[in-house]
């Protein structure tokens, strides 16, 4: 089986004690690609994911300012972001978006989101979108500032209904489903997964967060994406190996990976 984890935080401190074992289990489980999300612990730490990508040939990275870190942005942040995004193993800008769950000022989040969308478009890079308790505003910003660019992106940890899925698909997004889709009460999310065309589906973990059944509540890791793959393949009435291979090919196509060898050597931009 060939699997992809299109969204994890391999650089998270929760993995510091046993990261080599995490990588080994991912390989054993059939992970062909891992996308490590380079938001770090705020803007000064955006490059942490790149270090993981430089260490492991099947790991790739993103860089971006998470909406919860928007107030930490300084005059240097976007210059740093553009420099890091030029690294050959950085494949997208993200995760970026809007998060109204916590008390982070909207007047900091919105301009950070829009500026990163514009930067990604200028660099012809996909985006990884985070939205939490902010669907209406997120979709409005994407309609105005991303859809007209004709570039793809990933809706991370998709948790909407089929109508929201269709709206994201209409704007050219791939939809990434994670551990939440395995939860008993997530029937609406599974219904959305049913309506997504096969060539627009991705798998993710968001590790170390949001572990799928049967590991819910425990530390998540990339190898667990296999459990999500089984649930979603069953939901769609598809063979799990074919489903896994399809989502893995989708990821490679989206981010433009043509071989393992690219960017696997140490780079100097950090």
List each model region and its residues.
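Mid-domain alpha/beta scaffold segments of enzyme catalytic cores
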Residues: 1-270
């Amino acid at each position: 089986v060939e699997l992809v984890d299109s969204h994890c935080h391999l650089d998270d401190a929760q993995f510091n004690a046993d990261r080599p074992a995490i990588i080994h289990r991912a390989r054993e489980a059939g992970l062909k690609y891992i996308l490590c999300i380079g938001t770090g612990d705020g803007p000064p730490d955006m490059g942490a994911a790149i270090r993981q990508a430089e260490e492991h040939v099947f790991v790739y990275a993103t860089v971006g300012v998470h909406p919860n870190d928007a107030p930490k942005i300084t005059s240097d942040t976007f210059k740093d972001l553009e420099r890091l995004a030029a690294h050959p193993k950085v494949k997208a800008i993200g995760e970026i978006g809007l998060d109204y769950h916590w008390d982070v000022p909207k007047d900091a989040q919105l301009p950070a989101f829009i500026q990163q969308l514009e930067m990604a478009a200028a660099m012809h890079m996909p985006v990884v979108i985070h939205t939490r308790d902010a669907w209406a505003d997120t979709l409005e910003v994407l309609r105005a500032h991303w859809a007209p660019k004709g570039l793809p992106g990933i809706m991370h940890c998709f948790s909407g209904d089929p109508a929201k899925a269709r709206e994201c698909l209409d704007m050219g997004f791939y939809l990434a489903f994670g551990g939440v889709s395995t939860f008993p009460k997530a029937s609406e999310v599974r219904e959305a997964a049913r309506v997504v065309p096969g060539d627009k589906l991705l798998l993710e973990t968001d590790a170390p967060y949001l572990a799928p059944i049967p590991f819910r509540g425990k530390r998540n890791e990339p190898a667990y994406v296999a459990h999500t793959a089984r649930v979603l393949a069953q939901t769609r009435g598809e063979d799990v190996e074919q489903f896994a291979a399809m989502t893995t090919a989708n990821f490679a196509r989206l981010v433009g990976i043509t071989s393992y060898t690219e960017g696997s050597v140490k780079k100097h931009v950090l």
